[in-house]
Amino acid sequence: MLIALQGAVSQGVLWGIMVLGVFITFRLLDIPDMTCDGSFALGGCVCAVLIVNNNVDPLLAVLAGMCAGAIAGAVTGILTTVFEIPAILAGILTQISLWSINLRIMGKSNTPILAKGTIFSSVSHMTGLPQSTVAIILGIVLAVAIVAILYWFFGTEIGSALRATGNNEYMIRALGVNTNSTKMIALVLSNALIGLAGALICQSQKYADIGMGTGAIVISLAAIVIGEVLGRLLPGGLTQFSVRLASAVFGSVVYFLIRAIVLQLGMDANDMKLLSAVIVAVALCVPVVWERYKLRSSYTKGDEANA
């Protein structure tokens, strides 16, 4: 059980990087970007092929996976901004095309890297720590660094314009901001993080698979919603932007812990997609029910005071 929970934490932290990417489009830009399933697998496929077929350094392979994800995001951005295709449809088109592209890149449905070195195995050899522990430590370090960089970036003029585009596109456009540029930046940045996560998880699990991105959007949304629900329990709630970013990563860890516990209790692994959908639905319903409860309680207290 302890080993399963440790593996869940390592997976949760690494997936948290992807969740941050989805957070940018889903929460900040208010765009349902469906590219992520494809760009996640793209990052993993590019990373695996470079390591296995070209003996590229694992770190450079990760950076290449991140760049590949950014290119996928740019394609979606071009379809959305230049050709004015609705964002959700543009993402679906890119996602579908990436399925064939990933197959072309690997030349087969999966590519194992069991005999090759990875970032995690290299650090494990240097430190003597188990690879599962190394994955947790490196994942936390990367997640903290990315959260800090995103917090700084979204405090800049460009980052603030990007956030304002998601809040009120017409207002920010009236102020002279090119919203097409902000959308493009957001989609490229988002999918770069998703490609980075795909490459890291590829090295963590020692293989890349054509279907490794299937359902990634559901997992990410579940993590975001879980993180927001838990973040509201903090004294300051989600008022601080840094807390919103950190809660997305924390929500990812909680999601994978829940999944590991449920699997240990004997749930069929084939039912995990159903569990993910239920978690998202429940997490979305809880804030609504809670607000209605507080509103009803305030009405009751007001009636008692008037009586």
Whereabouts are the PLM-identified features?
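Alpha-helical transmembrane segments within multi-pass membrane transporters and channels
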Residues: 22, 55-96, 101, 143-144, ...
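Membrane-interfacial amphipathic/re-entrant helices at transmembrane-helix boundaries
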Residues: 1-18, 46, 54-60, 131-133, ...
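Membrane-embedded helix boundary and interhelical linker motif in transport proteins
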Residues: 26-82, 123-129, 234-237, 264
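Helix-loop-helix "hairpin" substructures at the membrane interface of multi-pass membrane proteins
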Residues: 72, 132-213, 217, 221-222
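Transmembrane alpha-helical segments in multi-pass inner-membrane proteins
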Residues: 194, 198-274
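Cytosolic-side transmembrane-helix boundaries in multi-pass membrane proteins
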Residues: 167-174, 178-181, 234, 239-243, ...
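Short loop segments and helix-boundary regions at transmembrane helix junctions
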Residues: 27-32, 74-118, 123-124, 207-210, ...
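Transmembrane helix-bundle core of multi-pass membrane transporters
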Residues: 87, 91-155, 185, 209-210, ...
